[in-house]
Design a protein with these regions (language model features):
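Terminal low-complexity/charged segments
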Residues: 1-146
Length: 146
């Protein structure tokens, strides 16, 4: 990823509230989006901040990592600019944001089924596409988690 000292890109004007995202904290511009590696990300604080600024959750991309963890890339659209917060699960789990952002419900259920991520704080993780009797983790190299 190429780094840039200043947000924004593409001539988009951000208001002062976006300065809270602090480009000096490691934001990098790549593939048409701004990315921030945030291993210690508080997803609930991030979600509250983004929603307060009228951002829209686009999706959460996931990828298996070493030691049974899963990388989670939270993609947000903020005034036409994509901001991505990249983080990693902790002991196979991560706090849910579905109660704050209902659009995350489907995404979290899908990530749970494909990568066996346990989203803590959810009232219910009912099956989305997983057939009865199958264990979550269908996309993990080691297969489903037992």
């Amino acid at each position: 990823m190429s780094s840039s000292a200043e947000m924004p890109a593409s001539g988009v004007c951000f208001d002062e509230t976006l300065l809270e995202l602090r480009s000096q904290d490691g934001w990098q511009h790549s593939n048409g989006a701004w990315w921030l590696e945030a291993k210690a990300l508080d997803p609930r604080a991030m979600t509250s901040f983004m929603l307060a600024h009228e951002a829209r959750l686009v999706t959460v991309a996931s990828m298996e990592r070493e030691a049974g963890e899963t990388r989670l890339d939270y993609h947000w659209d903020l005034k036409g600019v994509v901001l991505t917060f990249s983080t990693i699960t902790r002991a196979g789990s991560f706090p849910s944001i579905a109660d704050l952002c209902p659009g995350a419900d489907w995404i979290e259920r899908e990530v749970h089924e494909y990568f066996a991520v346990e989203f803590t704080g959810r009232d219910n993780t009912k099956p989305l596409m997983l057939r009865s009797g199958l264990l979550p983790g269908l996309n993990r190299k080691q297969g489903a988690k037992l």
